[in-house]
């Protein structure tokens, strides 16, 4: 039991040490309009909402199929405890066209939640790069490619699919979702995000998928992306190829749009989406005082003084001391008798 407690303490210390490096950015860092997810968290004190209104349309297949959907995606992201640990909630509400094709073709519509997933991701490795702007002696070294950029930052993802969804999406059980999130910053304008997921584990609807997204920034406000998502299921494989634009309206709001070509089993179709991402920024930077050797100074003369002055009774009695000091005494007047 003691060994277990020691191991837990060591693990918590290790995680706390890793979390000292911040994930907060001055501008919003949204996953939209792509389907992939960055390994970086939003940072403590950030409450971020990423929305997407979408329309999907494919050809009707024999027997039962879902050829059309109109819906709304929402991803909520925040961080409470550690800078590198993010908690998120993914949900989707949509109206689906359910079609039956045999001798005759018929259809009906179904509305409700198609997804409600609670998840968390933790950045286990963050790749650092050389600052080439400080290289002034060699033009070649200043503009040479940094091969460290081929090494990605890595995060692990763990989620739980709830079964609080509409009837056509129910799996009759709660199922886990696990994944690995990678990001390579090839330059200051180009990055590649790769996701590998194993979803709905332990159910008849389990699936394995990967997403590869390339993003390029035209300016500080405009960016574009290309993306390939492939999903392997027991009954069929789905592929979608997408592209789109994102516009940074201000530090806390991003607008985005996307278009996709779909291959779902033996049928094809298209997908279009428009979304808004915004955040509530309550982040506060934390600072540490270091000595000449880079070690943290736990107590400084100022902190010691604050501790002495910070006691309840010291503050309580200081009120009366201040009153005594500020209280003036009227001079006594002496009356003299007139002779």
Describe the residue ranges of each PLM region.
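Bacterial Sec-dependent N-terminal signal peptides
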Residues: 1-28
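Transmembrane beta-barrel domains of Gram-negative outer membranes and organellar outer membranes
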Residues: 23-201, 205-339
């Amino acid at each position: 039991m003691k060994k277990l407690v020691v191991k837990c303490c060591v693990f918590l210390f290790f995680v706390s040490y890793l979390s000292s490096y911040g994930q907060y950015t001055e501008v919003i860092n949204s996953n939209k309009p792509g389907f992939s997810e960055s390994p970086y968290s939003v940072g403590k004190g950030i409450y971020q909402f990423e929305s997407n209104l979408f329309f999907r349309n494919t050809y009707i297949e024999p027997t039962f199929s879902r050829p059309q959907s109109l819906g709304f995606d929402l991803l909520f992201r925040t961080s409470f405890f550690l800078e590198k640990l993010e908690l998120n909630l993914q949900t989707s509400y949509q109206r689906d066209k359910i079609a039956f094709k045999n001798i005759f073709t018929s259809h009906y519509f179904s509305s409700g939640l198609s997804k409600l997933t609670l998840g968390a991701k933790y950045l286990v490795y963050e790749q650092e790069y050389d600052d080439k702007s400080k290289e002034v002696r060699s033009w070649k070294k200043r503009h040479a490619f940094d091969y460290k950029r081929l090494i990605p930052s890595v995060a692990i993802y763990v989620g739980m699919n709830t079964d609080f969804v509409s009837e056509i999406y129910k799996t009759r059980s709660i199922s886990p979702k696990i994944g690995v999130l990678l990001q390579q910053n090839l330059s200051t304008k180009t990055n590649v995000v790769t996701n590998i997921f194993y979803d709905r584990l332990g159910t008849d609807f389990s699936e394995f998928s990967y997403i590869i997204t390339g993003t390029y920034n035209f300016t500080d406000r405009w960016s574009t992306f290309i993306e390939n998502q492939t999903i392997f299921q027991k009954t069929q494989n789905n592929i979608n190829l997408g592209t789109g634009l994102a516009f940074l309206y201000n530090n806390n709001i991003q607008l985005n749009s996307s278009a996709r070509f779909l291959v779902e089993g033996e049928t094809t179709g298209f997908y279009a989406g428009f979304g808004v991402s915004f955040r509530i920024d309550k982040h506060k930077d934390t600072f540490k005082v270091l000595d000449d050797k880079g070690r943290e100074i736990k107590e400084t003369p100022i902190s010691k003084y604050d501790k002495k002055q910070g006691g309840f009774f010291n503050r309580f009695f200081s009120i009366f001391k201040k009153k005594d000091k500020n209280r003036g005494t009227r001079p006594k007047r002496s009356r003299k008798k007139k002779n």
